[in-house]
Amino acid sequence: LDNRAFVGYENPQYPFTAVFGAEKNHPFIKDMLDYYDNKSFEFDKNNQYDKVNTKTVSDILIEDYDCKIGNQEQMLREGIKVYKDDVLCNPSVNSKTIHIFTGTWLEGNSSFVRNVNKFIKLRLTNKSRLKLYSYYRNIKFK
């Protein structure tokens, strides 16, 4: 990837922060860090998703950098490249990385579904397996 900064979609509504990057001193990184000034980080067992930053970072991208929702590849102000979800997040033949969504930061026992999801995604090691996985997830390939 050759961009001043990059992020990808998690789903059609939200770019995500599991995988992102930027050159040194990029304003997008400063904007994300500024959000955390004066924030409390007490863990709430009853609302474990309360501090997940996907929505917050998406709002920064939409409001400050004119990102459009809808899982579309786009170039934003300050050279921020936004990739479709099949490049940096969800498994496909276009994947550079895969976000496994294991929820390791969640407290308590990991669920059976999360364990199965992790087991499957960790074995998507070649294009044949990605195509098979994508077929069953109803993702179309060219």
What label would you give each PLM region?
Residues 1-142:
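Glycosyltransferase-associated regions of secretory-pathway enzymes
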